[in-house]
Amino acid sequence: MSNSFNDTFLKACKGEVHDHVPVWYMRQAGRSQPEYRKIKEKYSLFEITKQPELCAYVTKLPVDQYNNDAAILYKDIMTPLPFIGVDVEIKTGKGPVIDNPIQSYADVERLGTIQPEEDVPYVLDTIKLLREQLTVPLISFAGAPFTLASYMIEGGPSKSYNKTKAFMYAEPKAWHLLMDKLGEMTITYVKAQIAAGAQAIQIFDSWVGTLNVQDYRVFVKPVMERTFSELQKEKVPLIMFGVGASHLVNEWNDLPLDVVGLDWRLQIKEARELGVTKTVQGNLDPAILLAPWEVIEARAKEILDQGLETPNFIFNLGHGVFPEVEPDTLKRLTAFVHEYSANN
């Protein structure tokens, strides 16, 4: 890689002309890399994030290996929750587990606030360290209020989100207070990361697709409007992403953000037809990375042909990299996207 700074990703976020389609992958730092798996034999996720030099190494590894156009900070959306009074444990094969789920208005009232400089200095130190090392933009991220709330109410991952919806419908006052508290936490946490040097922010609303449009507008969209309006003042690109949320992309397009992330269920041309005018990011089905190269290349080409119709397009997956994916496949895919987009 050249030592000069590669700002292709930032240009694409703003819809500015650039010479190739930028590429990065959700969960590019981690599970599919042998070097990472070796580190995980010794340290947990949270232990890695608390060691800035080690965390920076893990974050930077896929950029060096795949020649990607952006790095995304290695951490978890659960990172800030312990500091507002939520006990979280990441269990192998199960994900985040919370032993004291939210069940009442009083539970919501008890939640505290985060002081990033005191509570998560290692996150900020890692960002500062990476800014010294990287020659591509650094993306950081946070969980959106709805998705964090779903974990806090369900006590962990869910397939139906019945407890979350029941709480939302039965306790609207408590729900909106919870959204307000999580919105403020997100704003404070993200602003500190931007101040430390993060050059773009992705908000993961991973599970909001469980809601219909009407409920999204009433129970979630107001806090997202406030959150993005505050973060927009920091003048870095803001990205929104959720899974199974194709019916909400037009709602996201209304928000004060820069990039709409798509999962693999909605084609880019369909998103444009639905009225998405902002930069689009996505959206190769991560399962396709387990197929023969000819299939991967053909699907990537289909996505590129749609994305290349405007300069505001970023190539990514429609969800995170699977552990079974070969690192060489990702390296080859990045090279293909760069070459094909530069010549078309």
From Swiss-Prot:
GO terms for biological process: protoporphyrinogen IX biosynthetic process. It is found in: Cytoplasm. Its EC number is 4.1.1.37. It comes from Halalkalibacterium halodurans (strain ATCC BAA-125 / DSM 18197 / FERM 7344 / JCM 9153 / C-125). The keyword Cytoplasm applies. Pathway: Porphyrin-containing compound metabolism; protoporphyrin-IX biosynthesis; coproporphyrinogen-III from 5-aminolevulinate: step 4/4. Belongs to the uroporphyrinogen decarboxylase family. HAMAP family: URO_D (MF_00218). Keywords: Cytoplasm, Decarboxylase, Lyase, Porphyrin biosynthesis. GO terms for cellular component: cytosol. This is Uroporphyrinogen decarboxylase. The keyword Lyase applies.
